[in-house]
UniProtKB/Swiss-Prot annotation:
Region (RNA binding): 254-260, 278-282
Molecular function terms, GO-annotated: metal ion binding; protein heterodimerization activity; protein homodimerization activity; tRNA-guanosine(34) queuine transglycosylase activity
Gene from which the chain derives: qtrt1
Binding site for Zn(2+): C311, C313, C316, H341
Organism domain of life: Eukaryota
Subcellular location: Cytoplasm; Mitochondrion outer membrane
Name of this chain's protein: Queuine tRNA-ribosyltransferase catalytic subunit 1
Keywords: Cytoplasm, Glycosyltransferase, Membrane, Metal-binding, Mitochondrion, Mitochondrion outer membrane, Transferase, tRNA processing, Zinc
Active site: D99, D273
PANTHER family in UniProt: QUEUINE TRNA-RIBOSYLTRANSFERASE CATALYTIC SUBUNIT 1
Length: 396
């Protein structure tokens, strides 16, 4: 398959599913190779909560996320430069993606005001007024030295409709141009555009049309997984992948539930991130192919099996459900063990998805995955059934 060299990224499409829009690709970046489809664990302040860089490496993680909003506040760009960027700071020699800080605007909306210039908000650390402009976002990300940087976009909640959505879409295009102009390191850092337009098909198409004219190395599908109905969600995903170029990576932001990952690979997405596996671990929830186990529950007090006997992660190799259940009463190590397992689960799921695409059996993989996850066809989520139907998979 032909490789496309764009900026600091070489993108190869290795295999495409003849039935669905799923594909297996390879990205070559400054810190090595990333095989897609891929799930990227999220470390808000340069660390995965409860997991070290070494442990991530040992799980075979090729790329993870850092958060510009938090790292730009503390410890700040000056310290980052002295530490040789985020890679040096967190002792991580593989690829890093940093977000622009835009998403935090929605979650901390009481702190922020959006104008054409940028986003104004009070620092949650010291209460100072800060203006995050597209230029400032790129300046911070250049200091962080991430392999993939995200443009600053004007983020509105996916449940909002009306003129604000259109305004945000047009502004995101203008801000993309400002981010491209501000990138002081295009031969080492890849700047991805973010497709906006809410749940409005026409606005999404307009945004796709404009942004795909820009010479950027990759595209993200933004403004989704913010509480909108799943039926709207998958339609916007497939609309986006229909209009995105084949020769560039497609990153669906904020998606991490196993079913969503599998369905969205079928719809043509390559990269995913979400805090879900690490956040849910803190509440004692371990991810398994048939759903999840609530390990705090007393039903596991005398259960001496591993979380999942087919999982090769350090937690499943060493500890029982009973042991982790007991730890929860006294020790934060329980969360640590489940976090390791949950990240391993996500990474392994995506490896299996990828293998099935390379071997030409992805549609069968999807059938088996759904059967294992839900058991009975009556329990399949209707949105997933409908979405898969549009790409040639009729669930049995």
């Amino acid at each position: 398959m032909a490789a496309t060299k764009s900026h600091a990224l070489v993108h190869r499409v290795l295999a495409e599913c003849p039935v669905t829009k799923a594909r297996a690709c390879e990205l070559q970046m400054p810190h090595g190779q990333v095989k897609t489809p891929v799930f990227m664990p999220v470390g808000t302040q340069g660390t995965m909560k409860g997991v070290t860089a070494d442990q991530l490496r040992n799980l075979g993680c090729e790329i993870c996320l850092g958060n510009t909003y938090h790292l730009g506040m503390r410890p700040g760009p000056e310290i980052m430069k002295k530490a040789s960027g985020l890679h040096g700071f967190m002792n991580w020699d593989r690829n890093l993606l940093t977000d622009s800080g835009g998403f935090q605007m929605v979650s901390l909306v009481e702190l922020s005001k959006v104008t054409e210039e940028g986003v104004q908000f009070r620092s949650p650390y010291d209460g100072k007024e800060i203006l995050l402009t597209p230029e400032k976002s790129i300046e911070i990300q250049n200091a962080l030295g991430s392999d993939i940087m995200m443009q600053l976009d004007d983020v509105v909640s996916s449940t909002i409709s009306g003129p604000r959505v259109e305004e945000a879409m047009h502004r995101s295009i203008r801000w993309l141009d400002r981010c491209i102009a501000a990138n002081g390191n295009p031969d080492r850092q890849n700047l991805f555009a973010i497709i906006q337009g809410g749940l409005d098909a026409e606005l999404r198409k307009q945004c796709l049309q404009e942004m795909t004219k820009r010479d950027v190395p990759g595209f993200a599908i933004g403004g989704l997984s913010g509480g909108e109905e799943k039926d709207h969600f998958w339609r916007m995903v497939t609309l986006s992948t229909d209009h995105l170029p084949r020769d560039k990576p497609r990153y669906l932001m904020g998606v991490g539930y196993a079913t969503d990952l599998v369905v969205c690979v079928a719809l043509g997405c390559d990269m995913f991130d979400c805090v879900f596996p690490t956040r849910t671990a803190r509440f004692g929830s371990a991810l398994v192919p048939w759903g999840s186990l609530q390990l705090k529950s007393k039903q596991f007090a005398k259960d001496f099996q591993p979380i999942d006997k087919n999982c090769d992660c350090p937690t499943c190799q060493r500890y029982s459900r009973s042991y982790i259940n007991a730890l929860f009463k006294s020790d934060t190590a329980a969360m640590h063990h489940i976090t390791i397992h949950n990240i391993a689960y996500q990474l392994n799921l995506m490896r299996s998805v990828r293998e099935s695409i390379l071997q030409g059996r992805f549609p069968q993989f999807v059938q088996d995955f759904m059967k294992t996850m839900y058991g009975n066809k009556d329990k399949y989520p209707q949105w997933a059934v409908a979405a898969l139907e549009t790409v040639g998979i009729t669930l049995q």
